C-alpha cells in the first residue's frame, strides 16, 4: 500500500511539473535564437512566481541580473516573438510589458515605477463561454512610437486555473534585453512598479473561471494607448514561427568565429526553402558552457562541455542545452 501511495504521489508530481512552462526563446526577423540567448536566465526551471510582493515578479526568479545574457538590437515597428518550451497549458491572460533602462538593459534590475504594458490577451466570450488563446509562440510588434534606448521586454502569463483563494494564481515570466532603434517620440504609460502592479483583490486575479464567468479584466495597468501603427498579436499553438531559422548566438565579446550554415525554413503554405548564411559561434570550441547555454546541435561549432553539475541534453536536432 505504501508503495502504491508513493507511486501515486510521484505520478501527480510528474504531471504537475509537466504542466508548467517557460518562455525561453526569442525570435527577431524570422531568426529564433537559442534558449536564454537574449532572455535572462531563471533559476527555478519552469516553476511560476506566486508571491505578489516579490522582486521575482519582474523577470522571474534569478532574473534580476543579466548573468551574461546578450542584448539584441531591434527596430521600432518590427515584430518579435517569445516561444515557450511547450504550449501554454493553464487558462489565464497573457501580457507584454516594457521598462526603459536608465543605462543598459544588462545593468537594469527593473526597479522603480518604470513598467508599461503594450499588450493584453484576455479571453473571448461566445454564448457566455470563455475561450483562451493558449499558444506556444506569441508574436507582437515593437511600438513604432517607442523612443530609442535599452529596454527590458517582459512576457507574463497569469495562470488562474486554480481559483483564488483556494488556489494561488501563477505568474509565468521572462525578460528579454533589447536595444530599440528607429524609434519615435511617444510617452509610454501609465507607468507602474513591479511588484506593486498587482493585488490579491484585483478582479482578474480573484476570478473563478468555473463559476459565473462571463467577463474578465486583465490585472495590471491599462495598455499604452498611443503605440502608433496598427499592431496585432499572432500566436502559434504548438511549435515555432513559420519561416523561422534556428540560429546560434553571436559571440558576446572579441572576434567571432564564423561558419557557413545551411538551414531549412518552412513558411506556411509555401513548402520549404534553403537559406545559406553565416552565424557566429557562441563560445569557442572546447570552452566550458554555462548552465542553460547551448552545447550542441546541427551546425553548432561552439563548446560542447557543460559546467560541472550540468549535462548536455538534446532538445531537437538543431539544439542541445546544458541542463
Swiss-Prot record:
GO terms for cellular component: extracellular region. Cu(2+) binds at residues 20, 90, 172. GO terms for molecular function: cellulose binding; metal ion binding; monooxygenase activity. Binds 1 copper ion per subunit. It catalyses: [(1->4)-beta-D-glucosyl]n+m + reduced acceptor + O2 = 4-dehydro-beta-D-glucosyl-[(1->4)-beta-D-glucosyl]n-1 + [(1->4)-beta-D-glucosyl]m + acceptor + H2O. Gene3D superfamilies: 2.70.50.70. Glycans are attached at residue 215. Residues 1-19 form the signal peptide. Disulfide bonds join 59-175. It is found in: Secreted. O2 binds at residues 161, 170. Has a modular structure: an endo-beta-1,4-glucanase catalytic module at the N-terminus, a linker rich in serines and threonines, and a C-terminal carbohydrate-binding module (CBM). The genes for catalytic modules and CBMs seem to have evolved separately and have been linked by gene fusion. Belongs to the polysaccharide monooxygenase AA9 family. This is AA9 family lytic polysaccharide monooxygenase A. It comes from Botryotinia fuckeliana (strain B05.10) (Noble rot fungus). The gene is AA9A.
Amino acid at each position: 500500500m505504501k508503495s502504491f501511495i508513493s507511486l501515486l504521489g510521484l505520478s501527480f508530481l510528474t504531471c504537475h511539473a509537466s504542466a508548467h512552462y517557460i518562455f525561453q526563446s526569442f525570435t527577431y526577423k524570422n531568426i529564433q535564437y537559442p534558449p536564454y540567448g537574449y532572455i535572462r536566465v531563471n533559476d527555478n526551471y519552469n516553476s511560476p512566481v506566486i508571491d505578489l510582493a516579490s522582486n521575482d515578479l519582474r523577470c522571474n526568479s534569478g532574473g534580476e541580473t543579466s548573468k551574461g545574457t546578450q542584448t539584441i538590437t531591434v527596430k521600432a515597428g518590427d515584430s518579435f516573438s517569445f516561444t515557450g518550451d511547450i504550449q501554454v497549458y493553464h487558462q489565464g491572460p497573457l501580457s507584454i510589458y516594457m521598462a526603459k533602462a536608465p543605462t543598459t538593459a544588462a545593468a537594469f534590475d527593473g526597479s522603480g515605477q518604470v513598467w508599461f504594458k503594450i499588450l493584453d490577451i484576455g479571453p473571448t466570450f461566445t454564448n457566455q463561454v470563455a475561450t483562451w488563446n493558449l499558444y506556444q509562440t506569441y508574436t507582437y510588434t515593437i511600438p513604432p512610437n517607442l523612443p530609442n534606448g535599452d529596454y527590458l521586454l517582459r512576457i507574463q502569463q497569469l495562470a488562474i486555473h486554480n481559483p483564488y483563494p483556494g488556489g494561488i494564481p501563477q505568474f509565468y515570466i521572462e525578460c528579454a534585453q533589447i536595444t530599440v532603434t528607429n524609434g519615435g517620440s511617444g510617452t509610454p504609460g501609465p507607468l507602474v512598479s513591479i511588484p506593486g502592479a498587482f493585488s490579491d483583490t484585483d478582479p482578474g486575479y480573484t476570478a473563478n473561471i468555473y463559476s459565473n464567468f462571463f467577463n474578465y479584466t486583465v490585472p495590471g495597468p491599462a495598455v499604452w494607448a498611443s503605440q502608433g501603427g496598427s499592431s496585432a498579436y499572432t500566436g502559434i499553438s504548438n511549435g515555432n514561427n513559420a519561416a523561422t531559422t534556428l540560429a546560434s548566438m553571436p559571440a558576446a565579446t572579441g572576434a567571432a568565429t564564423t561558419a557557413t550554415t545551411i538551414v531549412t525554413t518552412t513558411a506556411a503554405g509555401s513548402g520549404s526553402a534553403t537559406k545559406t548564411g553565416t552565424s557566429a559561434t557562441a563560445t569557442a570550441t572546447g570552452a566550458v558552457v554555462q548552465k542553460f547555454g547551448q552545447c550542441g546541435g546541427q551546425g553548432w561549432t561552439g563548446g560542447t562541455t557543460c559546467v560541472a553539475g550540468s549535462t548536455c541534453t538534446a532538445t531537437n536536432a538543431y539544439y542541445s542545452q546544458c541542463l
